[in-house]
A protein has these predicted regions:
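Extracytosolic ligand-binding ectodomains
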Residues: 4, 8-10, 22-394
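N-terminal signal peptide c-region/cleavage motif recognized by signal peptidases
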Residues: 17-19
Length: 394
């Protein structure tokens, strides 16, 4: 963390020397839309009450470090609401004069809030992964800090191809979110030259996944479910609903690595990351919150840091000016990922490396060596400009 802070201080001093500090209050609303959902299969993954908001607290500290030199103050207001009151929470914040927002929720929730806020506001999506939000369902006032399903699938695909695991067995769930994830892996296979030799669907029949599907039953059921698959190098689990994927490793009929929603998982960040200065980030987060960081915490932190960096460079809190700067060639931000992150100007998605995590350590980081792109290797992950049908950014 020390080096990024030093760079921020240098930027702050440069602005001060250019013309002195002017008072500016930057007010941001962080809205988390909480939908009813099943408890995670593992109690180790239960959601903390301050999920996302904890990352916002750390970002406020970081932004204040630079802001105090520039006369900038940051005020963050948070709201955790169910879907049916999310727009009311947004309306209240808009009525208080807020025009900058970070949203943690599913795709439909994010789109509803973006449409409600209108052109005079700027929203940063810190949670929704649906690729369609970066495609036909994009919005001009909505930028994406959370990686898309397409980016996550491409991160897995690059590593699989690098390992020469080109024959995939795809197991997907029966929910719409699972089908969307499966489609992202089909797309990735087609782009990177893998072959899906067989697909199977794991039907969600309900019941308690913790008790009704104990290890004795799992040990019997999963091998039977996966028996007779065509020869494959790798199992891809498309289980956005967290119904079955954690049970696949070590239980398949054929002993094969599992990637995707279980086994080796693509993530934006995790608590074991130590490289690129992340150790200090982890220690500061844990000292502040008393727990380990989750992806949602990191993504809210990153969204608020994106806003803070743009405010520092432009000396304004105007949504239109901040958006223009973020999408421009001068914007870049250190994000504890080994290289600066920037935005794609064709759909508002943040370019970023993605970590491949086995539950304990970073196994690898995508984009992988040798996967090239005319603009940036980071653009090998997710929708490229010719693929995107986003019209709002043209």
């Amino acid at each position: 963390m020390r080096r990024p802070i030093c760079l921020l201080l240098a930027a702050a001093l440069a602005v001060l020397s250019a013309g002195g500090a002017a008072a500016l209050e930057v007010r941001v609303g962080v809205i988390r839309v909480d939908r009813p959902q099943l408890a995670p299969i593992s109690r180790l993954e239960e959601w903390p009450r301050d999920l996302g908001f904890a990352g916002g607290r750390l970002a406020d500290e970081d932004n204040a470090t630079t802001g105090r030199f520039l006369g900038h103050t940051y005020v963050t207001e948070t709201a955790a609401v169910p879907p049916d009151t999310a727009e009311a929470a947004l309306d209240r914040m808009l009525g208080e004069g807020l025009r900058l927002f970070v949203v943690l929720g599913q795709g439909d929730d994010v789109l509803a809030l973006a449409d409600r806020a209108g052109d005079g506001a700027l929203l940063l999506n810190a949670g929704a992964r649906e690729t369609r939000l970066r495609d036909a369902d994009c919005r001009a006032n909505l930028l994406h800090v959370a990686p898309s399903e397409a980016m996550l699938a491409d991160a897995v695909a690059e590593f699989a191809i690098w390992k020469k695991w080109t024959r995939w067995a795809l197991i997907s769930g029966s929910h719409p979110e699972d089908r969307a994830m499966a489609e992202a892996y089909r797309r990735a296979a087609a782009i990177f030259g893998a072959k899906i030799v067989e697909e199977r669907v794991f039907e969600d029949t309900g019941g308690s996944r913790r008790t009704d599907t104990g290890h004795v039953l799992v040990q019997r059921q999963i091998p039977v479910f996966s028996e007779g698959m065509k020869d494959h190098d790798l199992v891809i689990a498309a289980d956005a609903s967290d119904v079955f994927a954690p049970y696949l490793p070590f239980h398949m009929w054929d002993p094969r690595p599992v990637m995707g929603a279980a086994g080796l998982r693509p993530v934006s960040f995790h608590a074991a990351t130590e490289a690129w200065g992340a150790t200090q980030f982890q220690r500061r987060f844990e000292a502040l919150t008393g727990r380990q960081v989750r992806e949602e915490d990191y993504q809210v932190w990153l969204a608020l840091r994106v806003l803070g960096e743009a405010v520092t460079r432009t000396d304004t809190a105007d949504p239109a000016e901040l958006r223009a700067y973020m999408l421009g060639p001068e914007f870049e931000l250190a994000a504890f990922k080994g290289q600066k992150v920037t935005f794609r100007d064709w759909n508002g998605q943040l370019r970023q490396p993605l970590l491949l995590y086995d539950g304990r350590i970073n196994v690898s980081v995508s984009p992988q060596d040798g996967f090239l792109h005319q603009r940036s290797p980071l653009d090998t992950l997710g929708l490229d400009a010719p693929e995107s049908s986003c019209a709002a950014f043209r």
